[in-house]
């Protein structure tokens, strides 16, 4: 048994312009090779594009998109007696948000388009409306969990 104390849970910091934790989580996920200023640039340009497209507050569009993509349940591979089962597990809010952000960024990277800011803004607007690749990913995850409900007792 470890003698070390339990690690303190870190509180998410908020970004300098919007003073929002979700924006900061998005910046930290989009970050590549430690170029945080570039990540901030991409996010803020995407927010401006959302403002121009929808003529509403880009933060509310971001919140709506993340809320729409956040999964309630996921599947986890569990080895039981020589065979691997996909066991459905419930997801907490923080982990769900992290998954949603990862899916949104993955879907926007796959999109055809000029630059990342344009692709991200399009994906966020689509997700807020209830369409797009990230929403499809969430629905697919929920379908997988529903199909493997029989293995829920393996938790």
Swiss-Prot record:
Gene3D superfamilies: Ribosomal protein S7 domain
Keywords on record: Chloroplast, Plastid, Ribonucleoprotein, Ribosomal protein, RNA-binding, rRNA-binding
GO-annotated molecular function: rRNA binding; structural constituent of ribosome
GO cellular component: chloroplast; small ribosomal subunit
InterPro entries: Ribosomal_uS7, Ribosomal_uS7_bac/org-type, Ribosomal_uS7_CS, Ribosomal_uS7_dom, Ribosomal_uS7_dom_sf
Record's subcellular location: Plastid, Chloroplast
One biological process term in Gene Ontology: translation
One Pfam family per UniProt: Ribosomal_S7
Major place of residence: plastid
Keyword Ligase tagged: no
Keyword Chloroplast: yes
NCBIfam families in alphabetical order: rpsG_bact
Self-association and partners: Part of the 30S ribosomal subunit.
PANTHER family reported in the protein's UniProt record: RIBOSOMAL PROTEIN S7
Stated family: Belongs to the universal ribosomal protein uS7 family.
Its job: One of the primary rRNA binding proteins, it binds directly to 16S rRNA where it nucleates assembly of the head domain of the 30S subunit.
UniProt name for this protein: Small ribosomal subunit protein uS7cz/uS7cy
Annotated source species: Manihot esculenta
